[in-house]
Amino acid sequence: MTDIYRDGVVVIGAGVAGLAASRCLRAAGVPTTLIEALSRIGGRAVTADVCGEPFDLGATWLHDADRNPLVDLSDIPLIDSDALRTERVTVAGRLASPEELAAYEAAWSGVDAVVAPALGGPDTSLEAALAAMAGDPWEPLITLWEGATIAAVDADRLGLQDWWRNRLDGPNRVPPEGVGAFVARLLATEAILSCAAERIDWSGPGVRIGTAQGVIRGAAAIVTVSTGVLAAGRMRFDPELPLAVQRAIHGLPMGLLTKIALPGNDRLGLAADTLLVDREGAMTFNAWPFGRSHIAGFVGGRRAWGVADDPAAMEALAREELRRMLGGTALRGIGSAAHISAWGTDAAFLGAYAYAGPGDADERGVLAAAFPGERLVFAGEAARTDGLAGTVGGAYLSGVEAARRLLALRPGGGLHPPYR
């Protein structure tokens, strides 16, 4: 590899991983060119406006706050969202009874014991591991939550090991301005926007990145685009990537979680930060998050893909689910959708975040360790093995670690203190 301090590094993608890598390299004195296909930075962390209030279309929480680097770096007080949240559980259009709520809590508390036997054998799907709960009326809701809602993929396609390794049990924090606005401000650094990488030539001693704005050269490149984009061949590599890297990319497909914001002129008797769930439901909702004037809805997995290119169908689904939970009269106080996320159809991402199917959990580590020619490094939420896969905190750490790998090739290379 040529000298990164002389010839620089090209970072592809100005999401959280790319921003973190670029800031780290620049702090160490490495000439760094950060390019981004979109006209903005932040990647899958982007905050929209709903009636003058923030609504995150993508990343919404700073998960596992006790070990999330963005919590440590925050320059503002963060909201403890767990302390605010209450849960409203319905069954067949009515509030769950105390006995049903007790059964619901018991079902949740038994999940670890149910999946424990399967964890010791060959990897299987989360759905198969939860089969022992079949017959429990709360099993469908638990399966929906852990699969489609949290992992963005249905439980029959989600590997048990990947689910187990990436359970987010720590506290959650939220910046008042929204996660997207927060990272765009906190991690802001120079980037060339509307500059998609189309071809990466790593056949020589350095790299040449072909873009619509011309060829950009460097000693090495950090690739932070989604596995969905990589698997779709939107970015050509010359020569082709090693087979192990290709297998890792295809072994980490993109799931889909779609969010919808429905403004309301009537609080419907619901306190702020009320989580709405239904035992037979297809969606979950957060009513009036942090006192804001909208309801945020979440749908993941196959249902999300099924309406990915049809916003009207997505809104119809959300309204029908709310009718199930709150009754038809409640919909009179709910306005038309203000925003619907479109990660599944956005060519810059082709999904929300990556998951591993049965047998593929270790592909995250393969992608993170890949270092073709000592001049290509891959970073992003998919390349985490520490339980932070699929999170902005994980993406940040991945970007920093990718930068550190390149810096380590330089005798005496090191990191500026804030980037650890």
Put a short name on every predicted segment.
Residues 1-420:
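FAD-dinucleotide binding site
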